[in-house]
């Protein structure tokens, strides 16, 4: 036994040193400096060293001895800055060990990779000491960032994985998953920088079920000494719910960076395919270590992940996704084999061998190596391919849930957040701007863009066509347009938000008298100034809440301008009675077209077009209908007007009207349901009625209709009532109502006799059910299953998915006030207290 253990220790140390050497070889000088000095900066604590702060900061790493580089650094501090380095006190030190995890040291590490560092500490540290250590780590992150190195520290209590804690998407961590999969990744990718060796590697795979007993036997026999090893526990079996939660979160993360996430998403899919007897990759690597099979280029965890995914996709004969995952792997390694290198490193050798096995030709290598120069056609093709792969994973996840008798709403908040994000990113809707470049290519800018308008009555569809070339007949005729839409606003928005249109792009337009070049250039300047291209990704909280308009542009008279008729005419009007909506003797409306362009809190970009005399009324009703009563006001509202005449006047009046109506909408309350705004358009009076759930518009022909409409809205307040009796909603539900989503609100009755359900459909029509009995969880499961299986609303190529699943909420009382919280299958009161301060950053790391 002793010789066997010693042999294992030697293999472990050899592989760890190999990984350290490989990590340093792939790094630049600044990266090497940070990587090498981090253990020293955590072992010591001194005002002249980075990361210093006042207080009793835990210092000292168990079994740490400075290497040559670290000793040189300490000697320099002593020699040139007069620093006297004091070793931490003897005995068991607070920091058990410092480890990197993830792609560092693997073939997947690149010059742009960041560093994920686990600082494992003794469980006897108190709360204040942990906070001080966390603050020191934050200071070290800032120091590294000043050198151009991205480092993330994660404090790990040595006993945390024995608690089987879980989190939720709403807490911005890894969803309904326990920590076993995180531990799986740590065990297969960890590199020890300083401190204790990892004990788990010493336990044979066939003893995993009796992990603790086997470890105690090793200690009792004196084969191992307890205080020389980091013991985070064994890899126990995983439930179907845990796979579901982990896969859900990984799919969620893959939306923003699909190339990076494809391999890990498919590894989890492979695990679920093998369920209930999965082979965790960490166990596979450990088995080979024990057998002395140092395969896969030194048990490289990234290569072994590819190997496992290849086995899975080959077994199910999914060669389309297999080809995709190989390309993703190639791009991640970033070696560019089509270009000659003077120095051939180990990563290049690995990739060359794999490419030879895959039988790739030079043309494919050149195409992949040129990814930085991919333009819209290649990016759109890649986007569709990644989307198809993601949808396949989503469908397989739902099948896995059904196969194992799980509800797709086993965690309704989590599935709600994922579906909202999928819906926001991919559901194809009229007027929605599809963003096709989630970190696929760095630059889609085009030197030339041409907008061509085809009027009605021609062979081609009437509307606007966009080309990425100058308007010469030969090039236009021989190429397909990049995009078509009936309205110019949508094409400009698509080109801007996808990065084709920049300040350097030359614009051309063949507008057939509808829009000329100066007007197009003005619009492009206004849109680019008002809408930033890059925004932070929406938080899970934002995705679970009703969407809210964040940036709004109201574009007036872009395609139809009534003031153009004033040219060379004498127009009589009274400045004292000037009304741009009922102008002059003929009471003409000077707003002929309104285009809306807005970005919401889910980061969707939407466009809408309204034409004709009532365009202002229709646009107002639409804008206000998208603002639920408790919504925050938009961050910005801009009116852009492109009239030939009276431009400033029209713009100011529209801005005033919109601001006033938004104020009325967002400030209306249950006690003031009769608020209204009268507006005269083209000589006719219209009433906008600000009701509890939406805004209605009514034409008011005379005084009797006018006052009748006001009193009716004061009395009822609802434009639609499904019940014959008056529907009385809790005020907190009024504020949460949002168009476009089916919402269920559960409310406990005061006499504790069942519960009430308030259901708002996508048009905010209301149904109320009082004193319901039975299981809310079963209702949530059945409703979600019905919508996920029978309401296919999303169509993209061969993919059919319903993303707009109902949302479920619970009305609760907190400090005597009613609040709405996401409904969870486990009541808040019964949930174990979660240490979010420690859990969230760690779990973010695993699924990043």
From Swiss-Prot:
It comes from the Bacteria. Its main location: cytoplasm. NCBIfam families: PRK09450.1-1, PRK09450.1-2, PRK09450.1-4. The keyword Phosphoprotein applies. It is found in: Cytoplasm. This is Adenylate cyclase. Belongs to the adenylyl cyclase class-1 family. Its EC number is 4.6.1.1. It catalyses: ATP = 3',5'-cyclic AMP + diphosphate. Keywords: ATP-binding, cAMP biosynthesis, Cytoplasm, Lyase, Nucleotide-binding, Phosphoprotein. InterPro entries: Adenylate_cyclase_1, Adenylate_cyclase_1_CS, Adenylate_cyclase_1_N. The lineage of its organism: Bacteria, Pseudomonadati, Pseudomonadota, Gammaproteobacteria, Enterobacterales. Residues 541-848 are annotated as: Regulatory. Pfam families: Adenyl_cycl_N, Adenylate_cycl. One of its GO terms (molecular function) is ATP binding. It is an enzyme of class 4 (lyase). GO terms for biological process: cAMP biosynthetic process. The modification Phosphohistidine is found at residue 609. One of its GO terms (cellular component) is cytoplasm. Residues 1-535 are annotated as: Catalytic. Signal peptide: none annotated.
